[in-house]
């Protein structure tokens, strides 16, 4: 039989005071930062390393724990445990917390104290979940903020710039978790980022970005349209590149996964009830960019877009623009060209035709996946200055452009498809575009069509005349 660690044998976080010695504390890790190095003022030319984490031993009590020391010690200690695990801390130093200064960058805690670990005197031991009281383990599903203290995603979008820079709480479901992307900054520091798409009853897609390894590691364990999170103290900003509001995980953030609250249970029920009935809508909103077209105002020619792409070389963020152009290639009546594809209901990516599996979700092959048909058309766009080749026209944008649904298209004869093609070819259109540099894309530029409608001749002449073109 497993040996249980009884809470009564440890000092409770609620009982902490500075004069205590030979402490032994048990708690569950609810937050953790990355290891960082800083110049050592006492030893010029060397560095000291640090990381911090937050532990909890009851619903109302949690504290921040910091450790400083050599790189080997700090990295070894940090690698020893992760968020969600239970730890025993022996002989920490209790310090009074400087609330205003410290909580600018650390999670806000109800305690007046913080714990400091010494390389020579303190010890941290990881407990097996079988050795821990279930009351302690259940704390991982309890948000650190009041369960109703959050913004809905629609409220964030509606408030827009008034929330720019604010730190708030968010309750949402996970729509998709992107692959971590790694980069090197101009001063040769290595970095990483991971985009998580969220949704709730009010908003189909909202971006949250993780920049640190610990939050990225946590996010990789989340299941699309099954996981609900309560993210306390995320920063909200207006993303000028994507023209929308977005959230960022910061050092103050604590994320509670599948919170045990009435509000989270309502959201979870919403997910389950809509999971099978709205697959088509779910897929479509993956393909739709969450960009307000009214915020895209810059008009370009093809030549100018290619020039701007060269100016942006080395940048990962997309740019947006309006193009007055003709669809010069539209192979929707060619039997050898596939324009309708299956997309995964979990992540929105194209399903491999040969294996009939999603390459993104294949790591969890034990789960059954639903697929949905979607337009996936590559078109060429041409104006008087040149041609953008292999531009992506997909989802509902494709349906609106073609003037038919997937099902209507699939019932068309080859002659009807050819007639539809010639109705669209060589008609000047007003096209909203998202462009991003990509070495995988043809010409090094990935172009996504956000909207494509027949241009008003007067509007087109006016806009192009403003650039010296007609």
Curated annotation (Swiss-Prot):
One of its GO terms (biological process) is male meiosis I. One of its GO terms (molecular function) is single-stranded DNA binding. GO terms for cellular component: chromosome; cytoplasm; nucleus. It is found in: Cytoplasm; Nucleus; Chromosome. Residues 167-272 bind DNA. It comes from the Eukaryota. This is Meiosis-specific with OB domain-containing protein. Its main location: cytoplasm. The keyword Kinase does not apply. Single-stranded DNA-binding protein required for homologous recombination in meiosis I. Required for double strand breaks (DSBs) repair and crossover formation and promotion of faithful and complete synapsis. Not required for the initial loading of recombinases but required to maintain a proper number of RAD51 and DMC1 foci after the zygotene stage. May act by ensuring the stabilization of recombinases, which is required for successful homology search and meiotic recombination. Displays Single-stranded DNA 3'-5' exonuclease activity in vitro. Keywords: Chromosome, Cytoplasm, DNA-binding, Exonuclease, Hydrolase, Meiosis, Nuclease, Nucleus. Its EC number is 3.1.-.-. Component of a multiprotein complex with RPA2 and SPATA22. Interacts with SPATA22. Interacts with the complex BRME1:HSF2BP:BRCA2. It is an enzyme of class 3 (hydrolase). Belongs to the MEIOB family. The keyword Cell membrane does not apply.
